[in-house]
């Protein structure tokens, strides 16, 4: 595994962690809360965002306007069955999701969930580093690179690992601040 490949994988891991953080509900409306909601549309699971316009008219409301009005009920059912934790209200034209304020206990739970996502991201980055170090050692063993080159590559790899784990830590601090803001 080359350094560029390892860095690319680490970058993707940071992005995946950011997406995971986006699914955590804070006290504010955010359309990305519905990213993982799949609607059983004509027998196939379809992402909600491809079936409806999702907007946030204010800080506590998400508005879902299906492109096909006949799909209102199945969209409402999919949201109810999802793990979003919000109750949809259907007025016949649009579906509204009101975001209730978070209790302090719920905020603590969400901080723990965010910390878990961050730890999963850090572990994934360390696994990428381990795989890259293994491939560097293999190259060194086969005399394809010198011992000095291998050491240099491992040092660069460690710097990348530190950089991307620090980025995940920054994202976690941001998310914790976001969750804790009343």
Curated annotation (Swiss-Prot):
PANTHER family: MITOCHONDRIAL RIBOSOME RECYCLING FACTOR PSEUDO 1, RIBOSOME RECYCLING FACTOR. Responsible for the release of ribosomes from messenger RNA at the termination of protein biosynthesis. May increase the efficiency of translation by recycling ribosomes from one round of translation to another. The keyword Protein biosynthesis applies. InterPro entries: Ribosome_recyc_fac (IPR002661), Ribosome_recyc_fac_dom (IPR023584), RRF_sf (IPR036191). NCBIfam families: frr. One of its GO terms (biological process) is translational termination. One of its GO terms (cellular component) is cytoplasm. Belongs to the RRF family. It comes from the Bacteria. GO terms for molecular function: ribosomal large subunit binding. It is found in: Cytoplasm. The keyword NAD does not apply. This is Ribosome-recycling factor. Keywords: Cytoplasm, Protein biosynthesis.
